[in-house]
């Protein structure tokens, strides 16, 4: 697929509000910006219209309004003023710009606008406000994959971006918005689509198409005998689904090698459960609804690599694994009480088939660990919609858990700051000895127990213990700070941070991962 085919709409770099190519101006700002209008060359012409409107509606910067302006200033005669509300309090953050832009474009769509021009007034407290606003503006413009495939149309003809700054600022904004929008499309297409449209084989087909003729090497493991031999726990989760050819498992490997000498190597493993029935520990009472998004960890991996594909960062190598399975229930389903030997040689005692995510990722993570031992400055990641406990703990925020070497590097703190700056905050959870002790086997048959028989929301430290399990079961724990070969590892439990099904998601923590890992090399 071409870059343009993955964009929600055509992104255009604008130079003036007087450009007749646009049929509305969407202005995002706060009350604090009122005094700045005259001093900002790009928007000074509409200052009188905004000031006059404020005399009629003093709360305009706390809401979204359609304002008629003179066509000699804005050719379309339409100005959509979308206020952020108060952004001066300690707890206000840059996401107010994201929300305001989303509301502004939503109003533009309802007004029949096809080519809006987005302008975000600067705020020294939030240097990334223009980018964050643009990503918010594109959210209602996204068209779901199945609709695009059937109707082949977009909601807008184009979205103009008028950056407040010089030409370099404008060019960088356009480049980043295109990269993020394409990555969002890949993420949403995979993460939101239903379990048949994005069954494991069709995810593989989609990813191969999305990265065709690009900078990412895509390899798909589709031989079920190979998956059974090399990734036995992943195979166990998909055992019931394997009886249906269209539902058979796929392991998708993505690889990027940037220009120049490699300084950092990232291994990112994503959970890709296309529908989570719970397996034999069946989800009942409507709790299965929305479980098509249990593949969103893999979706974030796909989006992360699309951003890399577009931005072409230098001096890094990145390897991704999208672990695509379907946790079905049936005569051949895996069950509790099984003891399965993992790729690492650790024997795993199964307690709960609805804790399948950690099993799905474990063997590919072990493979990534094996590769990392020969890589330059490696950092391993798992990304998953893993536990309800994380949702109860942090709401719509992802949680990151570092092992010893990653913690010593200060990575979680750094990426937390990056998330704040780019409007996608992330929380830090810490691991303690009891998290590791919890997963020690209770019988001689096994080395480790997968979990317990309770849901995570009824388990103490229910989102921290899986990170300990993944370390022990992959033997990453043998590469701690005091070992001869330390390996950095960070587990990210996304919980429900991308939003509520079936609303359009906002890929999370994709913005933060790209900003923290990729942008420093661009």
Swiss-Prot record:
Cofactor note: Binds 2 Zn(2+) ions per subunit.
Listed name of the protein: Putative aminopeptidase W07G4.4
Its EC number(s): 3.4.11.-
Residue numbers binding Zn(2+) 2: 271, 276, 294, 356
GO molecular function annotation: manganese ion binding; metalloaminopeptidase activity; peptidase activity
Keywords: Aminopeptidase, Hydrolase, Metal-binding, Protease, Zinc
InterPro entries tied to this protein: Leucine_aapep/pepB, Peptidase_M17_C
Pfam family, any one: Peptidase_M17
Cofactor list: Zn(2+)
Biological-process GO terms, alphabetical: proteolysis
């Amino acid at each position: 697929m071409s870059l343009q085919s993955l964009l929600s709409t055509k992104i255009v770099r604008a130079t003036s509000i007087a450009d007749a190519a646009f049929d509305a101006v969407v202005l995002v700002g706060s009350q604090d910006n009122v005094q700045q209008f005259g001093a900002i060359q790009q928007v000074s012409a509409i200052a009188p219209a905004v000031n006059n409107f404020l005399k009629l509606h003093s709360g305009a910067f706390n809401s979204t309004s359609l304002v008629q302006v003179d066509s000699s200033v804005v050719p379309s005669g339409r100005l959509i003023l979308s206020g952020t509300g108060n952004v001066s309090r300690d707890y206000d953050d840059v996401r107010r710009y994201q929300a305001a832009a989303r509301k502004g474009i939503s109003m533009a769509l309802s007004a029949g606008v096809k080519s809006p021009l987005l302008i975000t007034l600067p705020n020294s407290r939030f240097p990334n406000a223009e980018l964050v606003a643009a990503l918010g503006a594109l959210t209602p413009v996204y068209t779901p994959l199945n609709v695009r495939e059937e109707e082949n149309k977009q909601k807008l003809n184009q979205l103009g971006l008028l950056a407040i700054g010089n030409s370099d600022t404008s060019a960088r904004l356009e480049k980043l918005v295109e990269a993020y929008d394409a990555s969002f499309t890949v993420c949403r297409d995979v993460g939101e689509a239903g379990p048949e449209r994005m069954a494991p084989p069709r995810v593989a087909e989609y990813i191969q198409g999305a990265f065709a003729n690009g900078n990412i090497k895509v390899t798909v493991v589709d031989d079920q005998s190979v998956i059974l031999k090399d990734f036995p726990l992943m195979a166990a989760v998909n055992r019931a689904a394997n009886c249906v050819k269209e539902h058979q498992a796929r392991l998708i490997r993505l690889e990027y090698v940037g220009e120049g000498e490699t300084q950092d190597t990232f291994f990112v493993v994503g959970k890709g459960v296309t529908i989570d029935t719970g397996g034999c520990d069946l989800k009942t009472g409507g709790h299965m609804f929305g479980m098509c998004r249990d593949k969103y960890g893999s979706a974030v991996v796909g989006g992360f690599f699309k951003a890399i594909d577009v931005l072409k960062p230098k001096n890094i190598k990145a390897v991704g694994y999208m672990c695509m399975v379907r946790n079905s229930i049936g005569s051949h389903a895996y069950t509790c009480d099984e003891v399965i030997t993992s790729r690492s040689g650790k024997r795993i005692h199964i307690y709960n088939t609805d804790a399948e995510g950690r099993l799905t990722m474990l063997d590919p993570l072990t493979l990534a660990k094996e590769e990392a031992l020969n890589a330059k400055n490696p950092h391993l990641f798992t990304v998953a919609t893993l536990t309800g406990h994380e949702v109860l703990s942090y709401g719509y925020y992802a949680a990151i858990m570092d092992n010893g070497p990653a913690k010593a590097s200060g990575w979680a703190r750094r990426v937390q700051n990056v998330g704040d700056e780019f409007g996608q905050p992330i929380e830090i959870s810490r691991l303690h000895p009891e998290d590791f002790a919890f997963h020690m086997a209770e019988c001689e048959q096994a080395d480790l127990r997968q979990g317990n028989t309770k849901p995570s929301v009824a388990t103490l430290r229910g989102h921290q213990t899986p990170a300990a399990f993944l370390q022990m079961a992959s033997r990453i724990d043998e590469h701690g700070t005091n070992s001869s070969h330390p390996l950095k590892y960070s587990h990210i439990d996304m919980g429900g941070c991308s939003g509520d099904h079936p609303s359009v998601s906002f890929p999370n923590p994709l913005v933060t991962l790209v900003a923290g890992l990729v942008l420093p090399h661009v």
